[in-house]
A protein has these predicted regions:
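Glycine-centered, phosphate/nucleic-acid-interacting loop/turn motifs that mediate DNA/RNA or nucleotide
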Residues: 59
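N-terminal helix-turn-helix DNA-binding core of bacterial DNA-binding proteins
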Residues: 5-44, 66-79
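Short, hydrophobic-biased segments on the C-terminal half of alpha helices
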Residues: 23, 52-53
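Amphipathic alpha-helical dimerization/coiled-coil segments
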Residues: 1-7, 28, 75-99
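Short beta-strand "wing" residues that participate in macromolecule-binding interfaces
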Residues: 62-63
Length: 99
């Protein structure tokens, strides 16, 4: 995912509330198993795995296997944390304007 074509794709995948929550969890916890994410969000492992696959295609996450254990992490952790912080700041500013 490079250049301007990647931006709409990234926005589309992060527009899914579950995917956005998964990214937040990964930003807070580093590498983590899909079952741990599923438990944290109260969804099935299958549903979380589908979301992780979409995030992988959008080049947001990557995974590593160790035996039968799969762990996911952010592909670009520093940049992703900056993006999450910028989105939080935008929401705060927009909320202040509405008051």
């Amino acid at each position: 995912m490079r250049g301007r074509d990647g931006v709409p794709r990234l926005c589309r995948v992060l527009g899914n509330p579950l995917a956005f929550t998964v990214v937040q969890i990964l930003a807070e916890n580093g590498d983590i198993r899909p079952s741990q994410i599923a438990q944290a969000v109260g969804r099935s492992v299958a549903r979380v795995s589908n979301v992780l696959a979409a995030l992988r295609l959008a080049e947001v996450v990557r995974y590593e296997t160790e035996g039968r254990t799969v762990r996911y992490r952010l592909k670009h952790p520093r940049e992703t944390r900056k993006l999450l912080a910028a989105l939080d700041s935008f929401i705060e500013s927009a909320s202040a304007v509405r008051r």
